[in-house]
Amino acid sequence: MDNKIIVALDYETENEALNFIDQVDPSLCRLKVGKEMFTTLGAHFVKQLHDRKFDVFLDLKYHDIPNTVARAVRSAADLGVWMVDLHASGGLTMMEEAKKILEPYGKDAPLLIAVTVLTSMEDLDLLQIGINASPMEQVIRLSHLAKRAGLDGVVCSPQEVEVLRTHCGDDFKLVTPGIRPAGSDFGDQRRVMTPKQAIQTGADFLVIGRPITQAQEPLSILKAINASIA
């Protein structure tokens, strides 16, 4: 299955989420479960998505001491998720140990992806936490570190895709939030791009939330987005 669309579930209740999920098709998208929904609904919710044949990106952005992160990544693998992420700013050792713990899973291991710079952050935001670099510079730095650790790819804004292809190669997966279909509200993400533009720059997977989940006819929107990037 070569779905490029990952739908970010942003519902407050299980019933709302399942109502949406039952309107869409696992052949058209994968699903992202983040901190809010996982904290509220837990592993049982992920299993329900698997029962409906959806691949799941468990977006918990682990960032802790290496042993703790590695064990959390192993738990995600045991849950059967398709992709899981951690913060590259946790360091090389943390990422290496997380990757190593997945070795026994072989081809069944989830993709391990690093978060570089959150798409809501700009130069001033980085400066305020002691990083005297532009978002692009920091993304490149952390992406190199993730590749060195053996990770499968990174989360990055669409504007960084072309540069990262040059730095990290074609086999390095680029997962891009900040995707808004033409005419959509930008919401809380500042570095945005349309699905067609993002794919044309070389993105592998597109994370899209509210333009699909809050649509009156989500299946129609999802089909239209897929058609635009075909």
Curated annotation (Swiss-Prot):
Which SMART domains did the record assign? Answer: OMPdecase
Q: Which residues form the active site?
A: 61 (proton donor)
Q: What biological processes does GO assign it?
A: 'de novo' pyrimidine nucleobase biosynthetic process; 'de novo' UMP biosynthetic process
Q: What class of enzyme is it?
A: lyase
Q: Which reaction is the catalytic activity of this chain?
A: orotidine 5'-phosphate + H(+) = UMP + CO2
Pathway assigned to this chain's UniProt record = Pyrimidine metabolism; UMP biosynthesis via de novo pathway; UMP from orotate: step 2/2
Annotated substrate binding lies at 10, 32, 59-68, 119, 180, 189, 209-210
A single Gene Ontology MF term assigned here is: orotidine-5'-phosphate decarboxylase activity
- A single Pfam family it belongs to is OMPdecase
Q: Which UniProt keywords apply?
A: Decarboxylase, Lyase, Pyrimidine biosynthesis
Cross-referenced HAMAP family? OMPdecase_type1_B
Recorded hits in PANTHER family, A to Z, give: OROTIDINE 5'-PHOSPHATE DECARBOXYLASE (PTHR32119:SF2)
Query: What does the UniProt record say this protein does?
Result: Catalyzes the decarboxylation of orotidine 5'-monophosphate (OMP) to uridine 5'-monophosphate (UMP).
Describe its partners and assembly state: Homodimer.
Kindly provide the name given to this protein in its UniProt entry: Orotidine 5'-phosphate decarboxylase
Organism name: Haemophilus ducreyi (strain 35000HP / ATCC 700724)
Specify the taxonomic lineage. Answer: Bacteria, Pseudomonadati, Pseudomonadota, Gammaproteobacteria, Pasteurellales
